[in-house]
Regions:
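Basic/aromatic-rich interaction segments and small domains that mediate binding to polyanionic partners
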Residues: 4-67
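Short intrinsically disordered terminal tails
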Residues: 68-72
């Protein structure tokens, strides 16, 4: 698995019901709280307004790629 870093775009692999988030929602990593736990901001694509912030363990995240040459 690729290492997740601050500013990476990630998707949830599991629901996070305590924050009203569902599997597949996409967010941006904004901080790393402790080893393997990341603060992720979820925002509305149309407005850019954040609708949720959640501390999510790495095992519930998948790093997303948008350029073919970055995926390996």
């Amino acid at each position: 698995m690729d290492e997740i870093k601050v500013l990476d775009v990630v998707a949830l692999t599991e629901h996070v019901p305590e924050h009203g988030l569902r599997r597949g929602e996409v967010g941006t990593v904004i901080d790393q709280w402790k080893d393997g736990v990341f603060e992720v901001e979820f925002s509305n694509d149309a407005t850019g307004e954040a609708y949720a912030f959640a501390a999510v363990p790495a095992e519930k995240l998948i790093k997303l790629y948008f350029r073919k040459d970055e995926a390996a």
